[in-house]
């Protein structure tokens, strides 16, 4: 994918899932051709679930470069992974358990600790991953975000007061 921003408007949920799977497939192919790996960050909620289910089926099941794909999350609920509200748990059920991806290339956010501790641990994991690729900054090949009916994305809700924290990458 290029650095150019393209806005695609799709009003049908089924077509949205199909387009998302297609875009992810294309981004993965381009990233692997360019640098031999694909780093994607996904959100939770209902938006990506249909896309995840499509990616776990043909033609994506056998055509995606799963062995070179690395999955990260943009947000997580502070619940066990087997809880119905877990973003990782939903992705595990709909996608990860169905595809041939090495377990050490799936990076769920720590959910069973204080949020600040989990954020620090995840930041360190991201830093190590991207430094090992030779990048000083975390630059994902693709970030997939959903938008809730109230306008929230990645657990950032309208009107939510966010405590600013300086993070050193």
Residue locations for each model-derived region?
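Glycine-rich beta-strand-to-loop/alpha-helix junction loops that act as flexible
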Residues: 42-47, 145-149
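Class I SAM-dependent methyltransferase SAM-binding "motif I" and its flanking Rossmann-like core
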Residues: 145-169
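Ligand-binding beta-strand-loop-alpha-helix segment within the catalytic cores
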Residues: 2-4, 64-144
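A glycine- and small-aliphatic-rich helix-loop capping segment at beta-alpha/alpha-beta transitions
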Residues: 53-64, 89, 93, 158-167
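Short glycine-/acidic-enriched loop or helix-start segments at secondary-structure transitions
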Residues: 51-53, 83, 118, 154-156
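N-terminal glycine-/serine-/threonine-rich phosphate-binding loop
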Residues: 1-40, 116
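Short, well-ordered amphipathic alpha-helices
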Residues: 24-27, 50-60, 92-93, 123-130
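Short glycine-rich or small-residue beta-strand-to-loop segments that form or flank ligand, phosphate
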Residues: 39-43, 72-75
